[in-house]
Amino acid sequence: MPSRSKRVLLYSHDSFGLGHVSRCRTIANAIVGADHSVSVLIVSGSPVVGSYEFRSGVDFVRIPGVVKQISGEYDSANLRTNIEHTLEMRTRIIRDTADIYRPDLFIVDKEPLGLRGEVGPALHLLKERGTPLVLGLRDVMDDPTQLAKEWERKNVVPALRDLYDEIWVYGLPQINKPLTGIEVPPSVRHKMVYTGYLRRELPLHTDVPHEGEEMQGPYILVTPGGGGDGEDLVDWVLSAYEHDGNIPYGAVIVFGPFMSATAREAFKERAAKFPNIRTLTFTNNLGVLMQRAAGVVAMGGYNTFCEILSFDKKAIIVPRTRPRLEQFIRARAARNVGLIEMLDADRGRDPQAMATALRQLPQQGIPSDVVVPGLLDGLGSVWRLVSKQLAHPHRGPASLEVPDAPEAAAEDPDATSPSRART
């Protein structure tokens, strides 16, 4: 029987914002870029997953979408069905996809059991087949007290102990340890590997959004990520320009696809009064705008933080603190290391405070001024971890097809190895 190419399945948690699908897309593109014989299939309910550019060898299964309200409650995104019915459909599609696709490796992003446990049946199916199971975590999850309560409610620790073979943390322990303060057995901590942050690169051929081309001089990129909770950030920046006429740079504001139409229109009217401010709702070429920018003002989600590091940009981070402290913890840690500056909106959104920060941006340092070994080694580390898993045959019942003979993965001799956690 002929051999088949290796297959990776990625589950992308998708209930709020762009972060999860963007991270999975970056990882998928890196995997197939490192080995053209590998295929990667992403399972996601993100409404914008089809807007991203994927390399040959990557495809996605779009499951019915859900949205997470600011209150923390979930609802169906588009279907006129209750959330329980939507989750039942998602659960079956995820399991059936895993069953038919027969991956050689399953990587779950962020949520160990998926949204409301929807990945559980697929995990158990693949575990019985001996498929390696990996949980990918961002550098910061949440305040330890809140995360501990959430994981206890979701019964996460048994899954970490009994189902997953490895836990990859897409960050560095010297910046943050996501499970600090969480009671997990030593066997779980032994599974943790710190990869470094995931470097972002621009495609070889990419168009510059015309809003960026229209700028006559240096500009600040303002990005609240998906935009669903970014209105306060955009309002604060516009208030600074309205308050202070001496800000040295113009601005390109990307609202994000999930910002309400009412808020976008109100912001557009305010921005139109300034000849050096441009606005747009969404672009899948945000990296191009960031590369050309003199600096960045952002909320500091994981992916935006990786882009700031990758393009070596001066940045002012205004983290949200509700419903999670993730962005605040990341921004505080990065500021303490010297990678970025931070403004705390909970202390009041004084227009003068933002204006002062924007005026001081030209004198601010760039991330590369600080030497952090292995800071952006994430993608290389992930590929070495993936290739290691793919090199081993399934440990359980054989699949319907015979897997390829293991191939040695080409490694960069100068690359930093992933860091395995011991604490």
Regions inferred by a protein language model and the residue ranges of each:
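Conserved nucleotide-sugar phosphate-binding/catalytic loop shared by glycosyltransferases and other
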Residues: 5-7, 12, 30-85, 89, ...
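A short, glycine/small-residue-rich beta-strand->loop->alpha-helix junction that serves as a flexible
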Residues: 12-25, 48-49, 230-232
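Donor-nucleotide binding loops and adjacent catalytic segments primarily
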Residues: 28, 199-295, 347
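Short N-terminal targeting/anchoring amphipathic segment
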Residues: 94-116
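A nucleotide-sugar donor-handling region in carbohydrate enzymes
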Residues: 137-232, 258-261
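A donor-sugar binding/catalytic signature common to diverse glycosyltransferases
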Residues: 285-329
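C-terminal amphipathic helix plus adjacent low-complexity
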Residues: 352-423
